[in-house]
Amino acid sequence: MDIDAYFERIGYKNSRDKLDLETLTDILQHQIRAIPFENLNIHCGEAMELDLEVIFDQIVRRKRGGWCLQVNHLLYWALTMIGFETTILGGYVYNTFNDKYSSAMIHLLLKVTIDGRDYIADAGFGRSYQMWQPLELISGKYQPQTPCIFRLTEDRGTWYLDQIRREQYIPNQDFLDSDLLEKNEYRKIYSFTLEPRTIKDFESVNTYLQESPASVFTSKSFCSLQTPEGVHCLVGFTLTYRRFNYKDNTDLVEFKTLNEKEIEENLKNIFNISLEKKLTPKHGDKFFTI
């Protein structure tokens, strides 16, 4: 695996020498704007692999994306390669529909230590929940970013990530009640502890998430990519673009329903993805918002 190929894939041409917050932020932003958060393998009849060589081939060489276990594993490798002190952590994702955090550790995120300060770096949550900058690991501090205001809080060794969102304007009235829309201004995202993990800790859940009928990842096909102003999402046959803070503390959310040919065209034109196998778009009943 070639670190230069990774940086070429994300379009990063800046310094790799300074192991500071500015460099970490720059790399994170390049990755989330180049590498989609997506689960299309599942809906093309292919596996979501955890092996780093396979992930590198999929994302860097074949210009695909991946889900958190893949894109954050790749980010962990890249940051470690250039000298950042990086630790894999495990997260428990909040389900709004059930009003609770997952019982299984289904999310992979990173802790990066710079000059004695700890930061959370996560390139694998996508949609309008995706951080654009690393979050300083300080309990109770509001950390405003372009997508929203993020906050980390700690209680008896467990950390919680939440966000305060803007109002949203949906010009296409047909989608005002879409099940893809986040309805809450305040939103819990996930919890985690600071216990170091390895990729092996995620092997069983990686299998479960792509095989179980109860998994949102088998219920819905999705692809999400950040832009300098917002985020594109394709869920099943529905394409959305959210422009953050387009006016008066309000996000603009545009919806469009695509046919199969348009899905293929938009995957290529918006997400830079050309699939090798046929995609079966799916919008099942499991809770998933953009």
From Swiss-Prot:
EC numbers on record: 2.3.1.5
Top-rank taxon, per record: Eukaryota
Location(s), subcellular: Cytoplasm
A Gene Ontology cellular-component term: cytoplasm
SUPFAM superfamilies with a match to the protein in the record: Cysteine proteinases (SSF54001)
Entry keywords, A to Z: Acetylation, Acyltransferase, Cytoplasm, Transferase
Binding residues annotated for CoA, in chain numbering: 103, 208
Positions where N-acetylmethionine occurs in the chain: 1
EC primary class: transferase
Pfam families the UniProt entry points to: Acetyltransf_2
Catalytic activity field: an arylamine + acetyl-CoA = an N-acetylarylamine + CoA
Binding-site list for substrate: 106-107
GO molecular function, one term: arylamine N-acetyltransferase activity
Function comment: Participates in the detoxification of a plethora of hydrazine and arylamine drugs.
Family: Belongs to the arylamine N-acetyltransferase family.
Protein name according to UniProt: Arylamine N-acetyltransferase 1
Originating species: Bos taurus (Bovine)
